[in-house]
A protein has these predicted regions:
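Catalytic phosphate/metal-binding cores of nucleic-acid and nucleotide-processing enzymes, i.e., regions
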Residues: 1, 42, 56, 63, ...
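Cap/insert and terminal regions of metallo-dependent hydrolase folds
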Residues: 143-216
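Active-site metal-binding motif and surrounding structural segment of the metallo-beta-lactamase
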Residues: 29-75
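Active-site metal-binding loops of divalent metal-dependent hydrolases
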Residues: 8-9, 26-28, 48, 75-76, ...
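Conserved beta-strand hairpin/beta-sheet module of binuclear metal-dependent hydrolase folds
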Residues: 1-36, 118-134, 148
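Catalytic core of the metallo-beta-lactamase
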Residues: 15-16, 97-152, 156
Length: 216
């Protein structure tokens, strides 16, 4: 069984620790990770939005853990360096390729968002993990019979259409129109899960929609 600790998920921050050793996303303060950072071996990053990428936290992780590896795709290499993470601690990975870290194997896959973003497939001694948030769809991506899926289920179609109609009527700014283009609905992710899950698979809905104009 894969051990996980969700420190935050949603527009206010995202950070998940897997098997006490792997941090996926880093959208929280260093203080929030104070009890776990010493055991971390690997950080997997997805995209630049501040609820997933906190430069100060990343710099402090690198300073306090000089052997910690930071894995990302090319679009996050410069932001990591600008944050203060030494180049020697950064691994730039190519989407669609598997990489070995001893404690696990990982593979990033590009997904559609309003900035470059990736999902992570992680092969652990405890099982296979698929992690993805902030995506419009998972077209072309499969992860059959994984043990755990941690995936975005951002909104219910009927509820968000009702919010859009209400805001149109009131002449308000309709943030939800952007949500439709940049995030995954409950219905779409359920269809994808049903097509990929095995009999013993488990799933967790992540990054559920909050009715705030500053969500990302």
């Amino acid at each position: 069984m894969i051990d996980y600790n969700i420190f935050a998920t949603g527009s206010k921050g995202n950070a998940v620790v897997i098997d006490q050793k792997i941090l996926i996303d880093c959208g929280v303060s260093f203080k929030a990770l104070s009890k776990v950072y010493r055991a971390l071996k690997l950080v997997l990053l997805t995209h630049i939005h501040s609820d997933h990428f906190q430069p100060t936290t990343l710099r402090l992780l690198a300073e306090n853990r000089p052997t910690l590896r930071f894995a990302c795709c090319a679009w996050l290499c410069k932001p990591l360096v600008d944050a203060g993470v030494p180049v020697s601690q950064i691994d730039v990975l190519e989407p669609g390729h598997m990489y070995g870290y001893g404690i696990c194997n990982v593979r990033p896959d590009m997904v559609k968002h309003n900035v470059p973003n990736c999902a992570w497939k992680v092969w652990l001694p405890s099982g296979k993990l698929f992690y993805c948030t902030d995506m419009n769809n998972l077209n072309g991506i499969t992860a059959p019979n994984y043990d755990l899926y941690m995936v975005e289920a951002n909104y219910d179609d009927a509820e968000i259409q009702a919010k859009i109609a209400e805001k149109k009527l009131n002449g308000e700014y309709i943030y939800e129109l952007g949500v439709l283009h940049n995030h995954m609905s409950l219905a779409k992710i359920n269809d994808w899960l049903y097509a990929n899950m095995g009999q013993n698979s488990a799933y967790i809905y992540m990054h559920c929609h909050q009715d705030k104009e500053d969500a990302t």
